[in-house]
Amino acid sequence: MQSFLQEVAADLYRRYGEDVSSLHILFPTRRARHFFIDALSHLAERPMWQPRWLTIDDLMQEVSGLHSGERIRLIAELYKVYSACHDEPFDKFYFWGEMLLNDFDTIDKYRIDADVLFRNIYELKELESDVSYLTPEQLEVIRQFWANFTDGATLSEEKRRFLAVWRTLGDVYHGFRARLQRQGIAYGGMMQRAAAERLLAGDFAFAERRRYVVAGFNALSACEKVLFRFLQHNAETDFYWDYDDYYLKNTDQ
């Protein structure tokens, strides 16, 4: 039985032959590329030029104009913003910073309104009545984010600290992003959001004609959906979705 990437390689080689080298092939991760190269090498009758390989982060970086920052540097930059509001040594902040960075990443990838999200936790009912413009996907991200901090009877020390600084998180989020923007670096979600906003504003175009293959994606973030719609309409693009047959054939799912 052929793997998904073997099937993609076989179909592309059948359609393009050695012209497959003219394609830009976009994978979710770099690891998928190695399996695809192995599958393609078994199909080719002689040595051939490889396609151009990209990950989603590579293309988001090109569109956004930002560069991916190393995680330790990102946390250090976050601490500089956070420490302006709260007196806490870096060694105690580090775990907290990891969690905040992950949360900021999710907020941006799903294009969540951070100002709505960071309202006072005790005004949850107000938030619930002010979500008519949000998609079900965005609502679910918000609910998952808030679920960790709403059970006052079982709060851990980390959660208590979160509640104590809740009112400042909006300022920390915006200040952190502005600081990174000035340095031309970003975390993954910030880079994706910047790319999506640039595409939606019509402020980006490829300098040359390109043919893309998007392979191996399934559940997409809001920013990825914007990018793929752009590729669909502004480049010759083939999509190979990696969905489980169970969900495709079972209409109740």
Mark where each language-model region is:
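Basic/charged alpha-beta structural segments of nucleotide/phosphate-handling enzymes
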Residues: 30-206, 222, 244, 249
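Short glycine-/polar-rich loops that comprise or flank the Walker A/P-loop
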Residues: 20-23, 47-51, 208-210, 234-237
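Structural beta-sheet core signal
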Residues: 25, 214, 239-241
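N- or domain-start disorder-to-order transition segments that initiate the globular core
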Residues: 1-12
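Conserved P-loop NTPase "ATPase switch" module shared by AAA+ and STAND
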Residues: 208-220
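Conserved RecA-like helicase ATPase core segment
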Residues: 210, 222-253
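Conserved RecA-like ASCE P-loop NTPase motor core of nucleic-acid helicases/translocases
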Residues: 19-32, 212
